[in-house]
Amino acid sequence: MIKLTDEGEKMLRECAESLVDLFAKNRIVKIKAKVTSGLGEGRIFVSLPYYMEAFNKFLGFQPYPGTLNAVIYDRISMENRLLLDLSRGILIPEHKEPNRVLGSVKAFPASINSVSPVAVVIPTRTTHPKSVVELLSPHKLREKLELEDGDEIEIEVYL
């Protein structure tokens, strides 16, 4: 049995990220998912001044205050979602405030059903399982795409 230290695990993760980046340049991964309602937490966090400014700075758009959530339902899409964990993406750093720490967020440019700009966001602190994808856009995506819970969407993620 081999046991890795935290430092060793970090080094392996960085190596894996480098390999994914090397082989995934200009790659598009597709994720199929079904729209689902969230708990409204995305709205709360996206509306915080730090995140609103950071998303604008790092993603190039002022996001609608909320996320669209979708649940992955097939194996290939889940594998593509897990690939995002190994990819660098755009890192929005954590932010320390007097009473709390706002966690970092990894983001990827994307489109949904050919609509952009969109970003897949992966907060380091989340209550969602990996099968739930959170999406940001300057648009209220439910209205723009006329989506209801259970509707299927195709997300193209640009690595």
UniProtKB/Swiss-Prot annotation:
EC number: 2.7.1.161
Binding positions (CDP): 38-43, 139-142
Pfam families given in the database record: CTP-dep_RFKase
Keywords assigned by UniProt, alphabetized: Flavoprotein, FMN, Kinase, Magnesium, Metal-binding, Nucleotide-binding, Transferase
Alphabetized SUPFAM superfamilies for the sequence: Riboflavin kinase-like (SSF82114)
Residues at which Mg(2+) binds: 67, 69
Pathway terms, separated by semicolons: Cofactor biosynthesis; FMN biosynthesis; FMN from riboflavin (CTP route): step 1/1
Alphabetized Gene3D superfamilies for the sequence: Riboflavin kinase-like
Binding annotation for FMN: 126, 134
Enzyme class: transferase
Record GO terms (molecular function): magnesium ion binding; nucleotide binding; riboflavin kinase activity
The protein's required cofactors: Mg(2+)
Cofactor binding note of this UniProt entry: Binds 1 Mg(2+) ion per subunit.
InterPro entries in alphabetical order: RibK_CTP-dep, Riboflavin_kinase_archaeal, Riboflavin_kinase_CTP-dep, Riboflavin_kinase_dom_sf
Catalyses which reaction(s): riboflavin + CTP = CDP + FMN + H(+)
Any GO BP annotation: riboflavin biosynthetic process
PANTHER family: RIBOFLAVIN KINASE
Similarity comment: Belongs to the archaeal riboflavin kinase family.
Function: Catalyzes the CTP-dependent phosphorylation of riboflavin (vitamin B2) to form flavin mononucleotide (FMN).
This protein's name: Riboflavin kinase
The species this protein was found in: Sulfolobus acidocaldarius (strain ATCC 33909 / DSM 639 / JCM 8929 / NBRC 15157 / NCIMB 11770)
Organism placement in taxonomy: Archaea, Thermoproteota, Thermoprotei, Sulfolobales, Sulfolobaceae
